[in-house]
Protein backbone atom coordinates (compact mmCIF):
# COMPACT_ATOMS: atom_id res chain seq x y z
CA UNK A 1 0.00 0.00 0.00
CA UNK A 2 2.96 2.34 0.47
CA UNK A 3 4.55 1.69 -2.93
CA UNK A 4 3.08 4.47 -5.07
CA UNK A 5 4.20 3.08 -8.43
CA UNK A 6 2.75 -0.38 -7.73
CA UNK A 7 -0.55 1.07 -6.53
CA UNK A 8 -0.75 3.37 -9.55
CA UNK A 9 -0.17 0.43 -11.89
CA UNK A 10 -2.93 -1.61 -10.20
CA UNK A 11 -5.40 1.28 -10.23
CA UNK A 12 -4.72 2.13 -13.87
CA UNK A 13 -5.44 -1.47 -14.91
CA UNK A 14 -9.03 -1.17 -13.67
CA UNK A 15 -11.66 -0.46 -16.32
CA UNK A 16 -13.52 1.73 -13.85
CA UNK A 17 -13.66 2.42 -10.15
CA UNK A 18 -16.92 3.29 -8.44
CA UNK A 19 -16.02 2.81 -4.78
CA UNK A 20 -12.86 3.04 -2.70
CA UNK A 21 -12.79 1.87 0.90
CA UNK A 22 -9.52 3.24 2.25
CA UNK A 23 -8.97 0.88 5.18
CA UNK A 24 -5.22 0.42 5.54
CA UNK A 25 -3.78 1.56 8.82
CA UNK A 26 -1.72 0.70 11.83
CA UNK A 27 -0.85 1.90 15.32
CA UNK A 28 2.22 1.62 17.52
CA UNK A 29 1.24 2.86 21.00
CA UNK A 30 4.04 4.96 22.47
CA UNK A 31 4.09 7.81 24.96
CA UNK A 32 4.67 11.11 23.14
CA UNK A 33 8.08 11.59 24.79
CA UNK A 34 9.20 8.13 23.70
CA UNK A 35 7.98 8.03 20.09
CA UNK A 36 10.70 6.64 17.86
CA UNK A 37 11.20 8.58 14.63
CA UNK A 38 11.16 5.38 12.56
CA UNK A 39 7.78 4.43 14.07
CA UNK A 40 6.33 7.89 13.43
CA UNK A 41 7.52 7.88 9.81
CA UNK A 42 6.15 4.37 9.26
CA UNK A 43 2.72 5.28 10.69
CA UNK A 44 2.49 8.54 8.74
CA UNK A 45 3.42 6.67 5.55
CA UNK A 46 0.68 4.06 6.03
CA UNK A 47 -2.05 6.05 7.80
CA UNK A 48 -1.74 9.34 5.92
CA UNK A 49 0.45 9.29 2.81
CA UNK A 50 -0.79 5.94 1.45
CA UNK A 51 -4.39 6.94 2.16
CA UNK A 52 -3.91 10.22 0.30
CA UNK A 53 -2.16 8.58 -2.66
CA UNK A 54 -4.71 5.81 -3.07
CA UNK A 55 -7.65 8.22 -2.81
CA UNK A 56 -6.10 10.58 -5.35
CA UNK A 57 -5.38 7.79 -7.84
CA UNK A 58 -8.89 6.35 -7.49
CA UNK A 59 -10.53 9.78 -7.75
CA UNK A 60 -8.63 10.44 -10.98
CA UNK A 61 -9.86 7.10 -12.38
CA UNK A 62 -13.43 7.95 -11.33
CA UNK A 63 -13.19 11.32 -13.07
CA UNK A 64 -11.65 9.88 -16.25
CA UNK A 65 -14.07 6.94 -16.52
CA UNK A 66 -15.56 6.58 -19.98
CA UNK A 67 -19.03 5.40 -21.02
CA UNK A 68 -20.73 6.96 -18.04
CA UNK A 69 -23.84 9.07 -18.08
CA UNK A 70 -22.35 11.02 -15.23
CA UNK A 71 -19.17 10.99 -13.24
CA UNK A 72 -19.60 9.71 -9.76
CA UNK A 73 -18.34 7.48 -7.03
CA UNK A 74 -17.82 7.09 -3.33
CA UNK A 75 -14.68 7.15 -1.24
CA UNK A 76 -14.92 5.94 2.35
CA UNK A 77 -11.88 6.59 4.53
CA UNK A 78 -11.51 4.57 7.69
CA UNK A 79 -10.66 6.92 10.52
CA UNK A 80 -11.18 6.51 14.25
CA UNK A 81 -12.77 8.15 17.22
CA UNK A 82 -9.17 9.20 17.89
CA UNK A 83 -9.67 11.65 15.02
CA UNK A 84 -12.14 13.47 17.27
CA UNK A 85 -11.20 12.83 20.89
CA UNK A 86 -7.58 11.70 20.97
CA UNK A 87 -6.14 9.33 23.51
CA UNK A 88 -3.03 8.73 25.58
CA UNK A 89 -0.04 6.80 24.21
CA UNK A 90 -1.38 7.36 20.71
CA UNK A 91 0.03 10.77 19.72
CA UNK A 92 1.08 9.70 16.24
CA UNK A 93 -2.12 7.73 15.62
CA UNK A 94 -4.19 10.69 16.87
CA UNK A 95 -2.26 13.00 14.53
CA UNK A 96 -2.86 10.68 11.56
CA UNK A 97 -6.57 10.35 12.23
CA UNK A 98 -7.08 14.09 12.82
CA UNK A 99 -5.27 14.64 9.53
CA UNK A 100 -7.51 12.10 7.81
CA UNK A 101 -10.56 14.03 9.01
CA UNK A 102 -9.16 17.19 7.41
CA UNK A 103 -8.25 15.33 4.24
CA UNK A 104 -11.79 13.97 3.95
CA UNK A 105 -13.30 17.44 4.37
CA UNK A 106 -11.02 18.90 1.68
CA UNK A 107 -11.53 15.99 -0.71
CA UNK A 108 -15.31 16.18 -0.34
CA UNK A 109 -15.25 19.83 -1.40
CA UNK A 110 -12.82 19.31 -4.28
CA UNK A 111 -14.57 16.23 -5.66
CA UNK A 112 -18.22 17.25 -5.21
CA UNK A 113 -18.36 18.81 -8.69
CA UNK A 114 -17.61 15.34 -10.09
CA UNK A 115 -20.39 13.77 -7.99
CA UNK A 116 -17.78 11.89 -5.98
CA UNK A 117 -18.76 11.62 -2.33
CA UNK A 118 -16.09 11.34 0.35
CA UNK A 119 -16.79 10.32 3.95
CA UNK A 120 -15.13 8.77 6.95
CA UNK A 121 -16.19 6.08 9.35
CA UNK A 122 -14.84 6.78 12.83
CA UNK A 123 -15.36 3.70 14.98
CA UNK A 124 -14.47 3.18 18.56
CA UNK A 125 -12.11 0.35 19.45
CA UNK A 126 -12.82 -2.65 17.20
CA UNK A 127 -11.54 -6.15 17.91
CA UNK A 128 -9.36 -7.07 14.92
CA UNK A 129 -6.21 -9.13 14.46
CA UNK A 130 -4.24 -5.88 14.90
CA UNK A 131 -5.96 -4.88 18.15
CA UNK A 132 -6.10 -8.31 19.80
CA UNK A 133 -2.48 -7.97 20.91
CA UNK A 134 -3.34 -4.76 22.82
CA UNK A 135 -6.27 -6.45 24.56
CA UNK A 136 -3.98 -9.04 26.13
CA UNK A 137 -3.01 -6.26 28.54
CA UNK A 138 -5.82 -6.42 31.14
CA UNK A 139 -5.24 -2.87 32.37
CA UNK A 140 -5.41 -1.50 28.82
CA UNK A 141 -8.55 -3.52 28.10
CA UNK A 142 -10.28 -2.32 31.28
CA UNK A 143 -9.34 1.35 30.73
CA UNK A 144 -10.42 1.20 27.10
CA UNK A 145 -13.81 -0.31 27.94
CA UNK A 146 -14.31 2.30 30.68
CA UNK A 147 -13.98 5.02 28.01
CA UNK A 148 -16.54 3.52 25.63
CA UNK A 149 -20.03 4.78 26.56
CA UNK A 150 -21.71 1.56 25.39
CA UNK A 151 -19.25 -0.47 27.48
CA UNK A 152 -18.22 -2.89 24.74
CA UNK A 153 -15.91 -3.14 21.77
CA UNK A 154 -17.32 -2.75 18.27
CA UNK A 155 -17.80 -5.76 16.02
CA UNK A 156 -16.41 -5.76 12.49
CA UNK A 157 -19.92 -6.27 11.09
CA UNK A 158 -21.08 -3.03 12.72
CA UNK A 159 -18.33 -1.08 11.00
CA UNK A 160 -18.88 -2.85 7.68
CA UNK A 161 -22.56 -1.83 7.75
CA UNK A 162 -21.57 1.83 8.04
CA UNK A 163 -19.15 1.53 5.14
CA UNK A 164 -21.71 -0.22 2.93
CA UNK A 165 -24.26 2.51 3.68
CA UNK A 166 -21.86 5.37 2.86
CA UNK A 167 -20.78 3.68 -0.37
CA UNK A 168 -24.38 3.06 -1.46
CA UNK A 169 -26.93 5.18 -3.28
CA UNK A 170 -28.83 5.41 0.02
CA UNK A 171 -26.15 7.96 1.02
CA UNK A 172 -26.24 9.86 -2.27
CA UNK A 173 -26.46 13.26 -0.53
CA UNK A 174 -23.93 12.56 2.21
CA UNK A 175 -20.41 13.87 1.74
CA UNK A 176 -17.77 15.39 3.98
CA UNK A 177 -18.68 13.47 7.12
Residue ranges and their predicted role:
Residues 7, 31-32, 36-41, 144:
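Substrate-binding pocket helix/loop in short-chain dehydrogenase/reductase
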Residues 24-28:
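Conserved NAD(P)H cofactor-binding loop of Rossmann-fold oxidoreductase domains
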Residues 33, 85-92, 113-114, 151, ...:
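Active-site loop immediately N-terminal to the catalytic Tyr-X3-Lys motif
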Residues 55, 96, 104:
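Active-site helix of classical SDR
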Residues 60, 109-113, 172:
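Alpha-helical segment proximal to the catalytic Tyr-Lys
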Residues 80:
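Residue(s) in the substrate-gating loop at a strand-loop-helix junction
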Residues 116, 152-177:
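C-terminal substrate-recognition "lid" of short-chain dehydrogenase/reductases
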Amino acid sequence: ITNYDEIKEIINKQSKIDILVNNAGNNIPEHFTKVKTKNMEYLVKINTVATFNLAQLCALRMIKAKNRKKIGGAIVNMSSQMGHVGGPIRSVYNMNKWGLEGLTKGMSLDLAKYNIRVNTVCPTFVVTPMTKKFLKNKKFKRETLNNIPLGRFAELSEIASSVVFLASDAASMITGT
